[in-house]
Amino acid sequence: MNPQLLRVTNRIIERSRETRSAYLARIEQAKTSTVHRSQLACGNLAHGFAACQPEDKASLKSMLRNNIAIITSYNDMLSAHQPYEHYPEIIRKALHEANAVGQVAGGVPAMCDGVTQGQDGMELSLLSREVIAMSAAVGLSHNMFDGALFLGVCDKIVPGLTMAALSFGHLPAVFVPSGPMASGLPNKEKVRIRQLYAEGKVDRMALLESEAASYHAPGTCTFYGTANTNQMVVEFMGMQLPGSSFVHPDSPLRDALTAAAARQVTRMTGNGNEWMPIGKMIDEKVVVNGIVALLATGGSTNHTMHLVAMARAAGIQINWDDFSDLSDVVPLMARLYPNGPADINHFQAAGGVPVLVRELLKAGLLHEDVNTVAGFGLSRYTLEPWLNNGELDWREGAEKSLDSNVIASFEQPFSHHGGTKVLSGNLGRAVMKTSAVPVENQVIEAPAVVFESQHDVMPAFEAGLLDRDCVVVVRHQGPKANGMPELHKLMPPLGVLLDRCFKIALVTDGRLSGASGKVPSAIHVTPEAYDGGLLAKVRDGDIIRVNGQTGELTLLVDEAELAAREPHIPDLSASRVGTGRELFSALREKLSGAEQGATCITF
């Protein structure tokens, strides 16, 4: 095993000793003291199966068969979640064949960040993770179930569902993906059209045609954003079946994997022979494997918050130092857009998760001795699923990458440093997705241009006010200020400025999409401006140093002058009403800082 990996793992174990012990005691108590449906009052039980088919009613009355909860995030708004419409039918059929029953226990909201990008609704996005966790818990609270299947793929949905699953950690759980859409317009061409539109060189219809050719079918978007990072991370964590992440929707193999997930969760229940509740399955080693997956693939920076919140739900305490120290030894081994031209389908064709797991295991950069939904040992995830005469089976995946431009070997990685860098300095702490930023753009020292809203940046760009070396500061975008929206709309104009050979960087306490690209961006700055962060004292013209290589984020202003400055705190009341934002006020006020997971749920 890599010594650094062991050191980080051991310090997480030590740091989490009390909280993890308390969590395990809690789920053990839940296992023994939670009222099972066999102890429900007759009226409770009758309500629970009133809408079931006669055969299922008889099974639930007898108490001899497993009842599996289905928590679904189906809606028609998310291309990745539309395939879930018919999953309950597939699952119920598979469960019947396994002498079990399946009930849709509840639905959770699922927001498409692609639809709300740059809109008021984006200010609900991060908060929706907490709502998803709570909504799933409502479904599971009926105490009718022996296990659960979680149907979710996209940005906040998988982290929220994980938090809920761990709150019911005495139950086994399997996550069930939907898979990516087929490749459409190449991502590089899509970005080219976006930048031309930002410069006024193509019209809205040309832009719309480009976007519609990129996002064109059911399934996840094919770039390597937060949705596909979710799938990568949870497969490395053993939360879904081996090789199941990136199989296309509506294919025979996808349907077979969905049915197999249903059968597998029945084996993991107290009535089966492989009892493994999710709260015991997800331990410190599993969490470290998830971080390694993120770093080795240059995944979404959103997971520097999501993984923290997910781990906390299991009583495990991680922080950005853990990400940073692992990033020093975990190389970048995948090049997927925005880190390169390939998409997630190219990744799958190059050997996918099995190749990457195999390489990292050989290098001693993953814990093999972990429990997974497929059984003990992460080496199971070097297998790939296939249909053998119409029957699902697993075989050894590729021994090495089938396309070295997409998946590199450990010996010849794309970079010897992981795809995420933690920055620190007097401005606070932040993260940068370095995997997508050319080395020559990772260091900048330039005057600040300060904005209080992302919507003010484009007019300044159009007026030529940013045609110079500068650090664009967009503040009061943190969790407590306005829910920490993604600021991906800033990328086209800032990308144009880079192409004009200006030295440009972004510094913000907000988020960027998992598809954040070539602009060096110090994001998730904590403490946020609204909550006492020095970012609130930055003024136009102040020199800021951003160094994605050494990990520096410094405001080069005399300390005495900074101490004398008053922080600028704008009136944000107008941004807290409308589009339902007023309903989330109580949650927003309780959100922790980005490094603490930006969560309002205490575990």
Curated annotation (Swiss-Prot):
Gene ablation phenotype (knockout): The mutant grows at normal rates on glucose and fructose, whereas on gluconate it grows about one-third as fast as the wild-type.
Binding of [4Fe-4S] cluster, residues: C154, C221
Activity regulation note: Sensitive to oxidants such as superoxide or hydrogen peroxide.
Pathway of action: Carbohydrate metabolism; Entner-Doudoroff pathway
Record's keyword annotation contains Lyase: yes
One GO process term, biological-process aspect: Entner-Doudoroff pathway through 6-phosphogluconate
Cofactor(s) in the UniProt record: [4Fe-4S] cluster
Pfam families in the cross-refs: ILV_EDD_C, ILVD_EDD_N
Function of the molecule: Catalyzes the dehydration of 6-phospho-D-gluconate to 2-dehydro-3-deoxy-6-phospho-D-gluconate.
Family of this protein: Belongs to the IlvD/Edd family.
Official protein name in the record: Phosphogluconate dehydratase
Source taxonomy: Bacteria, Pseudomonadati, Pseudomonadota, Gammaproteobacteria, Enterobacterales
Gene name per UniProt: edd
